[in-house]
């Protein structure tokens, strides 16, 4: 039977030492073309020719996380640019006197006029 110190030492070695080391050293993932490009884009390797046939799961997970963060940041920037463009175009339309309310009233007026003209035409026959 293990003593308390022996048991604690074994647990500490197991939780801190071996599992992380094994995850980093066991290279069991074969990256596809997209993953190879991601490994280059994130800076893990300088070119696709340097990438080995097998890499560790930990390296691929870190690479995917970096790409996910980059993509989210790009989408945030594009959303902000799109909002700025919409604000600018709305202000330009307001300067011209265009508004959604005016457009709605004009559409309803045209619709009602067309309905009245269609309604009166069959009655005249």
Swiss-Prot record:
Glycans are attached at residue 112. The chain crosses the membrane at residues 69-88. Keywords: Glycoprotein, Membrane, Transmembrane, Transmembrane helix. Pfam families: DUF1075. It is found in: Membrane. InterPro entries: DUF1075. It is a single-pass membrane protein. GO terms for cellular component: cytosol; membrane; mitochondrion. Its main location: membrane. One of its GO terms (biological process) is positive regulation of apoptotic process. The keyword Glycoprotein applies. PANTHER family: GROWTH AND TRANSFORMATION-DEPENDENT PROTEIN, UPF0389 PROTEIN CG9231. Belongs to the UPF0389 family. This is UPF0389 protein CG9231.
């Amino acid at each position: 039977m293990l003593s308390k110190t022996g048991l604690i030492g074994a647990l500490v070695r197991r939780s801190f030492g071996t599992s992380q080391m094994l995850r980093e050293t066991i290279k069991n993932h074969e990256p596809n073309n997209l993953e190879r490009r991601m490994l280059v884009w994130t800076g893990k390797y300088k070119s696709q020719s340097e990438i080995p046939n097998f890499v560790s799961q930990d390296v691929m997970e870190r690479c995917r996380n970096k790409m996910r963060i980059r993509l989210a940041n790009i989408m945030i920037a594009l959303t902000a640019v799109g909002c700025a463009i919409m604000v600018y175009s709305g202000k330009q339309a307001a300067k011209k006197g265009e508004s959604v309310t005016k457009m709605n009233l004009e559409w309803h007026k045209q619709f009602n006029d067309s309905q009245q003209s269609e309604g009166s035409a069959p009655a005249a026959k």
